[in-house]
Amino acid sequence: MQNMVILGATGSIGASTLNVVACNPEQYKVFALVANTNVAKMLEICIAHQPKIAHMVDAKAAQALKQQLPSHLKIEVTTGEDELLSLVSCSEVDTVMAAIVGAAGLPSTLAAVNAGKRVLLANKESLVMSGQLFIEAMQNSGAQVLPVDSEHNAIFQCLSERSQLEIGRCDLTGAGVSHILLTGSGGPFLTSDLSSLVNMTPDQACKHPNWSMGRKISVDSATMMNKGLEYIEARWLFNASSDQLKVVIHPQSVIHSMVQYRDGSVLAQLGNPDMRTPIAHCMSFPQRISSGVEPLDFFKVGQLSFLEPDFNRFPCLALAIEACKQGQEATTVLNAANEISVQAFLDGKIRFTDIAKINEQSLMNTATHPLNCIDDILALDFQSRQYTLNAITKLN
């Protein structure tokens, strides 16, 4: 029986994880659930899964949850940053699902890694921001990090066993890998007229053709910044050079990514677009468990098509690839800027096409400094956010 902590329990990845747990109750126990402010959802899942601990990042939300939880459940409600870091490091915890969206997820994810836990990594921003520090922490602690993002999970499954055991320090060339092919659907605006993008609304941007996701990641998919962040994540997870990474647009989201080998072989992982599949794979690796997902029906799939990315349509993707080449400081700045600009778009403060423009401004103009520890990373993250907020104010 594995004791699990689910960070971001009230989000879409949290919900999918709890669904997989419910399919396999004899193997997994929810030890703790962690959320930010969503008391109603947390109350619902606490009653359903009865964790030992429910942690709310927001203190007022924690108090509200404590008042509403039935007393007979005997669930301890906690709050506070130190309490969260202690929770993921607790000796009773085996596995941590790291699914807090954005930079907010970095401290708790890194704490779980430093504690040597089995970390199911759905928070791509942790690697985008901390990169080498994250990999070094993983190697020093002996933590097992397994990629939950469908693309990185697909790549992981297509690699050799030796490479799977060397996450963060893979020798792709030695393993015969020529290229990692990172697939992406192109989002809801793949075929829209370029001139129409300026008027796209948040609701339109959040209508992904294949996946059901939260609003921030849905906008990132529409700009393809999500693929750019995944490009950076793949660079660190698989120790890949920019020459070894390629982005391929695959509108059907059936092939989740591919690995091309020196001998001409291409291995691909296919499946229905449902996050329960990679979650179940990570939870049970190297075994396999039920995910609750319907098997892929090849007779209904139809045509599979592939396109080269158009950087005029997706300037955020180009920015992310360039930032990856520049290094850790640039990717930290870009990630922070993007979180602010996407939220501004969702709040109706800027236009869809302003996201890339503001991100580029921040990347070009935020002063950087060496990143030697997590405090350095968070300081640069804050600096980039402040610059971006000012840029948005000037725009309006």
Swiss-Prot record:
Chain sites annotated for binding NADPH: 10-13, 38, 123, 125, 214
Q: In which pathway does it act?
A: Isoprenoid biosynthesis; isopentenyl diphosphate biosynthesis via DXP pathway; isopentenyl diphosphate from 1-deoxy-D-xylulose 5-phosphate: step 1/6
GO biological process terms, alphabetically, are: isopentenyl diphosphate biosynthetic process, methylerythritol 4-phosphate pathway involved in terpenoid biosynthetic process
Reaction(s) catalyzed by this protein?
2-C-methyl-D-erythritol 4-phosphate + NADP(+) = 1-deoxy-D-xylulose 5-phosphate + NADPH + H(+)
| Cofactor names | Mg(2+); Mn(2+)
Which residues are involved in binding Mn(2+)?
Answer: 149, 151, 230
Functionally, this protein is described as follows:
Catalyzes the NADPH-dependent rearrangement and reduction of 1-deoxy-D-xylulose-5-phosphate (DXP) to 2-C-methyl-D-erythritol 4-phosphate (MEP).
* Record-stated family: Belongs to the DXR family.
Positions of 1-deoxy-D-xylulose 5-phosphate binding: 124, 150-151, 185, 208, 221, 226-227, 230
Q: EC number(s) per UniProt?
A: 1.1.1.267
Note whether Oxidoreductase occurs among the keywords: yes
Q: Which Pfam family name is an example for this entry? A: DXPR_C
Q: Which organism is it from?
A: Shewanella pealeana (strain ATCC 700345 / ANG-SQ1)
Uppermost EC category: oxidoreductase
Native organism taxonomy: Bacteria, Pseudomonadati, Pseudomonadota, Gammaproteobacteria, Alteromonadales
Would you tell me the protein name for this molecule?
1-deoxy-D-xylulose 5-phosphate reductoisomerase
